[in-house]
Amino acid sequence: VADLAKMPHLLIAGATGSGKSVCMNALITSLIYKLHPLHIRFIVIDPKMLELSVYSAIPHMGRPVVTSPKRAEQVLSDIVVEMEKRYRRLAESGVRNIEDYNKRQQEETKLPYIVVCVDELADLMMSATSNKVEMLITRLAQMARAVGIHLVLATQRPSVDVITGLIKANFPARIAFQVASKVDSRTIIDANGAEKLLGAGDMLFLSTGQPEPTRIHGAFLSSEETDRIVTFIRDQGLQMMALEGISQAEGENTETEVDLGDPLFREACEVVIRHKQGSVSLLQRRLGIGYQRAARLIDKLEHAGVVSPFDGSKAREVIVDQAHVDAMFSGSAGEPADRSS
């Protein structure tokens, strides 16, 4: 048995029907069997819309299952923001990892582990924003382990344009199911062998720090068993709050996300235009607000087209002028600003 926290991320690849999705189901099931929703939350990205949507009903979910590649990019950006927030909390507490942090906390203030499951990486890597997706995944893979965020990526296209060198370098733990050729096998585990597997759960597991892959066979979990597990957990009636700071609804549009009646939003527009850049820390300093409030305002500024999308550690570029903001707010009434964080 391998511990995901020690991997600390996992890459799964293999041909269609070789057992990838069953492996993902078994992994999720083993975690929800052992851990309460207070201790672990899942962010599931499933562009195929079929394999993992069954888990939407369980309280372990940090948000509804993501099915749109564009929404997936936003959610990955939100997880990077959550990672940075957790690093600040750990630094303020004087600890180096989530285990030490949680030992000092009461039960209700402990940080849950977050497991990000992507069932088809190829759909994200083939999207128009693949470079940004790769950058976000790489950033999380490099830094997220210490704050309890772990990635599990699966793909049925083990090619170099999907499993890039940058991604592979940050995923030392990998599982190769049956593939069509030696080239695909080497792309996944840097060795031949996966092309000779039998399928139906037969796999080669390359663990962190292990020079050679180990041949093992995965557990089979039927759809009926998964449904029974989900139904049992759902019937407990436990209600959990969604993860704060993670985009929630599918199919959101700009009109519903940007509240022009929020006076603090207009102040934020003027601050970023005056400083010719936008960042969460800038809004915190200039508006005297907390991190969560500032992060939400930055998201609103992006949706309104005031600042550029998230691009790693760079400050966001301001792409409108004051005249544009004045026109956008013409006719809106002012109210007392809510500066709560």
Name each region found by the language model.
Residues 1-7, 23, 29-30, 37-44, ...:
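P-loop NTPase motor-domain active sites and their immediate coupling elements
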Residues 10:
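Conserved beta-strand position immediately N-terminal to the Walker
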Residues 13:
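Residues at the beta-strand->loop junction immediately N-terminal to the Walker
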Residues 16-17, 155:
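The conserved Walker
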Residues 20:
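Conserved lysine of the Walker
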Residues 54-79:
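P-loop NTPase motor core
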